[in-house]
Amino acid sequence: MLAPSASISRMQREVRNGHRGAAILLTGLPAAGKSTLAQALHATLFGCGWQTVVLDGDSLRIGLSRDLGFSDADRQENIRRASELAALLVENGQIVILAMIAPLAELREVFAQRLGEDYREVWCSASLAVCEQRDPKGHYARARRGELAGFTGVSAPYEPPLQASLVLDTGTQTVEACLDRLVTWLGECSVLHKT
């Protein structure tokens, strides 16, 4: 099956938006600060007139992927769906901010393969101890009690990215400091380049 051709090209959309489309994956342990940083980046870019959208892993899990669990196959399918949605949005000139654990290198590679040169990977690096201390949803505590099987960081692995485009120390740096570094870096790597 072939996708229909668009009557308005990506280049036309990007000219109208004043910037190119791109996808930025914020990956890290649960409670590493991905969603907080994604929302801060979204607000900053929106305030500057950029067309942005946040795809948060938790939101996708209660909507688009509500039929999926946490088996290896379900995690793979969740990432596939998110990468396809991100690709559609990027093609329409959006800057897509993905806040997802994406715990394994092979899962992050799905994004890299699907999104190609439009993809940037940012590791929100925070120690397991810091993430467990934060535990805003009580998931770490539940996982430690054996109530959550396959919870990343406790009973399922998180593979730190070896090829992340940017590493942010979200465990010790403030949200503001991480946001400032992220915005500066996005400018340096031409994601925030006016067309």
Which residue stretches match the model-derived regions?
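The conserved Walker
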Residues: 30
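Residue-level preference for the first positions of well-ordered beta-strands
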Residues: 21-23, 51, 95-97
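Conserved substrate/cofactor phosphate-moiety recognition/catalytic segment
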Residues: 39-87, 91
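Conserved lysine of the Walker
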Residues: 34
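ATP-dependent NMP and nucleoside kinases share a basic, alpha-helical "lid"
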Residues: 63-70, 74, 86-144, 150
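Hydrophobic anchor at the beta1->P-loop junction of P-loop NTPases
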Residues: 26
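Small-molecule kinase domains that catalyze NTP-dependent phosphoryl transfer to phosphate-bearing small molecules
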Residues: 125-128, 133-181, 188-194
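Extreme N-terminal, non-catalytic leader segments
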Residues: 1-23
